[in-house]
Amino acid sequence: MSFPRGSYDPAASNSSPRWPLSAEDANSSREAAGHQKGSDPSGDVRNEELAKLEIAVLAVIFVVAVLGNSSVLLALHRTPRKTSRMHLFIRHLSLADLAVAFFQVLPQLCWDITYRFRGPDWLCRVVKHLQVFAMFASAYMLVVMTADRYIAVCHPLKTLQQPARRSRLMIAASWVLSFLLSTPQYFIFSMIEIEVNNGTKTQDCWATFIQPWGTRAYVTWMTSGVFVVPVVILGTCYGFICYHIWRNVRGKTASRQSKGSGEDVAPFHKGLLVTPCVSSVKTISRAKIRTVKMTFVIVTAYILCWAPFFIVQMWSVWDDNFIWTDSENPSITITALLASLNSCCNPWIYMFFSGHLLQDCVQSFPCCQRMVQKFTKDDSDNMSRRQTSYSNNRSPTNSTGTWKDSPKSSRSIRFIPVST
């Protein structure tokens, strides 16, 4: 994360360090190094060791995110199965994660390499807009996917009323809303002349606010829109989902107990007839709860990855005792950079909960296909040999003794299982 310091004073200036509200838009290695070491008379220097660490982390995140999400999209494209609503949401969440990689991580990686933003004013505004757009898209796509799981579990009859159309409308709304909410970046960020250590002036892509409290308002709004509000919605949806599943399972259990005791009555709770909202507990457990678990893991990963970043952002603008050199701590810097690790985790979560996606992904590559075929052939040969050996050992002709004279043995031989 970048916390440019230098001559910036929140009490005396309305210009803000490049607050992108994206973990990658941060070079915590900037001006403070020159202030601490005084090795460069121009003052526009940075902590090179920390900068190298940032560049390495961003490069790894970019490569892993691109490979993982591209593999998921390729597997979804090649899968012979009929595309479900969950696959539709996974596809668009992978696209949102690719947007994070290309619009957020990659520009910041280039920015860290060049130290200062190298480009015209319009490019500065576009980059800042796309960085925040990717953040909104990733968060809101997760919200609509969780909302779809809530509808599927708590209101199953609604899934019969044009479910594909509703899902596409929800996805389109999340993309459009993300684009609109990130549009103010065009008016907040621009190429301006900033003063660094020792009075040196340079051009960089920074945010400018009319009022001194603008930075606090901006960071608080972005934290609420990208993190707090989505987390509240996600928590509410999962609260209803868990309550509904618990009530359904309890009703089914009470119904089975009543049937076992010979009572032909449905269970009552507080004078009301308790009837399960879904036809079968097994159906919930195997189909819907698996996708609910997958979405829950994705939500948990999102919170764990992004919470440290937003905590540091809020701390830096609301704590009057905060100094920019605090962000020179490598642990703070890397913790903030790891926010985009969420885009790397999601593909593996999809593949873990949808085993066929991993198989379809592997089959997309010829080299992996040959390896799978070789292992499958070896396993098939080994299984055939084991089956033949097992059958021969169980055959009466290979047995000793008077098995024909023993009716008990003769009857038992008929029921000896032979694996197929």
UniProtKB/Swiss-Prot annotation:
It is found in: Cell membrane. The modification Phosphoserine is found at residue 406. A lipid is attached at residues 367-368 (S-palmitoyl cysteine). It is a multi-pass membrane protein. Keywords: Cell membrane, Disulfide bond, G-protein coupled receptor, Glycoprotein, Lipoprotein, Membrane, Palmitate, Phosphoprotein, Receptor, Transducer, Transmembrane, Transmembrane helix. Residues 1-54, 114-125, 190-225, 316-331 are extracellular. Residues 1-45, 379-411 are annotated as: Disordered. This is Vasopressin V1a receptor. The gene is Avpr1a.
